[in-house]
Amino acid sequence: MNTPAVPAITDRRHLANGRVIPTESYSDQPYIVRTDDGAWLCCVTTGPGHEGVQGQHVTTLRSTDQGRTWSDPVPLEPGDQRENSYAVMLKVPSAPRLAGHVPRVDEEPGTPPAGRVYVFYNHNTDDVREIISHDGKQSIRRVDSLGHFVFKYSDDHGRSWSAARYDVPFRLFQCDRANVYGGRLCFFWNVGKPFILNGSAYVSLHKVGQMGRGFFQQSEGVLLKSDNLLTEPDPRRIRWETLPDGDIGLRTPPGGGPISEEHSYCVLSDGTVCCVYRSIDGHPVESCSRDGGHTWSEPRYRCFADGRRMKHPRAANFAWKCANGHYLYWFHNHGGKVMREAPGNADGGGYDDRNPVWLSAGIEIDTPGGREIAWSEPEIVLYESDPCVRISYPDLVEEGGRYYLTETQKDLARVHEVAADLLEGMWATLAAQLSRGKGPVANDDRRLLSLPLHGAAMPVTVPLPPLPWFRVRDHSVLDLRGKDTGEGVALELELTLPDGAPGRVLLDNRDGAGRGFCLRTAGAGALELMLNDGQTASHWISDPALDVGRPHHVVVNIDGGPRVISFVVDGRFLDGGETRQFGWGRFSPYLRHMNGAADLHIAPEVKDLRIFGRILRTFEAAMRAAAGSGRRASA
């Protein structure tokens, strides 16, 4: 019997090219710490069926070859059918005393073994089988986000775990006391990784005040701080404090919605703690603490370096500090007002559209209030061919100058190596924009066309080399099915529009049958790209970003991997602003190419033109825009 072949997808960003982390069925939160014996220790929530079913549990695995192979899973709670879920780990640094640690007079001599690993997780200790919604009208049988917050530890680099589990006590907040059980039963979970600051350990917790609409109906974030976890060998003597001060956790900005959850923390070079978390407001929320988590700045929506609000649905959005002192931020680059006001957003619609995954690069900057992080324009880092597949709950691992991301789409967990030149280009470009240094050199790799030629005028018509195909026949299988190539095309042009009229054709290679592409004005400062291979047509309209009479640098990317059309104007990625949920759009997975007539027609409004047989990364577009502005200024 022949087994159907699966076409190879060469694009490293595609999920299928990751290394699988073994799980039972459901897979969540594949988080990694590097142990002192050099292994990767991964904790993952798994189970026999869908998310939240009885028997859901945490396992750990070890890899000594960057996720190519894994040890047999070790369950934290062997044989326990009570839900134990949503684990995060913290490794005790090898140094016996951390900088900033001052021993208390009642602290006994001795330290935990070097490299001890703690794992924190939810445990349904009381075996609660059913709860009621906040309005009392609904019976809820999913019970994996309540009970006790507990930990175990390993002194053998994650090969085994302590037999005993230990409760982490936390203070009741206003939302706990106001829940349907008056705080006698608390709802919570955690996805945020622990961190260390001034000799103390901090563990995130997401409190849930109301269960019901959208499952979690009201939520906020707190920190559980231990001033002796890193130095106390006896887990029974570990002390805990709930932060922030008072009884209200990290919430949305004034006027925001009731959802503030999945908090992710970074410690800046001056000791500032920066937190980012999800909402149903269409934007990620951030807040900073400059006193070790006791008080926090008024929450605000996260912005790019130029002040534009970032957009994000109700999904995990995590930030990490890298070994070079810079940062990376995982988000999904859509949302805004349109999403916030969409029917069904609070009922669960906000959970959708976690594909593709975008990264923003961060660099610390000085502000009057202290250090903050400036964030770059976005880049696609991972995707799956089916837009409905959701990608989330990542972790970042660095080793030997290489970068790896873990992720899950709830069925499979994987590890992916990320192109280092992508990250370095993002950081370098942002640094140049912040006047910190010279940006990366322009890469003309796979440039197919560059006009006008030196000393010549822009031609009206020019022969156009063949453009890459997005989908071809797979000759390795008998049925010659189609396969995606992952190829892309970038149109880079400098132009000045004389008016705001729609329908002005700027670039056109269409033949008499309509095959090819056309870039034209769509009115009000927007551009429209039309693609046609003779049987399949796609189009996308940009945000209205072009001003009449002003020169603009435009990059249009036709990315055949995730099948995304995007526009970058004057170095800014167009994300839809407040008028659209998505600034980028998808073209048909069945569109094979955008080739048409032999010649390309160019409008006089186009002053410079380059066409590439690949996409231009956003940071490349930004640097090219800056170079074009410099040329115009010199002229």
Say what each PLM segment does.
Residues 493, 550-558, 565-567:
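Short tryptophan-centered beta-strand motifs in secreted/extracellular beta-sheet-rich domains
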Residues 1-28, 33-82, 91-187, 195-262, ...:
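Beta-rich carbohydrate-recognition and catalytic domains
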Residues 467-530, 564, 606, 611-624:
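Extracellular glycan-recognition modules
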Residues 84-88, 313-317, 392:
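Repeated scaffold domains used in trafficking and secretory/extracellular systems
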Residues 575-606:
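Flexible glycan-contacting loops in extracellular carbohydrate-active proteins
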Residues 529-553:
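Short, aromatic/His-centered strand-loop micro-motif at the edge of beta-sheets
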Residues 436-487:
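Low-complexity, glycine/proline/serine-rich flexible segments
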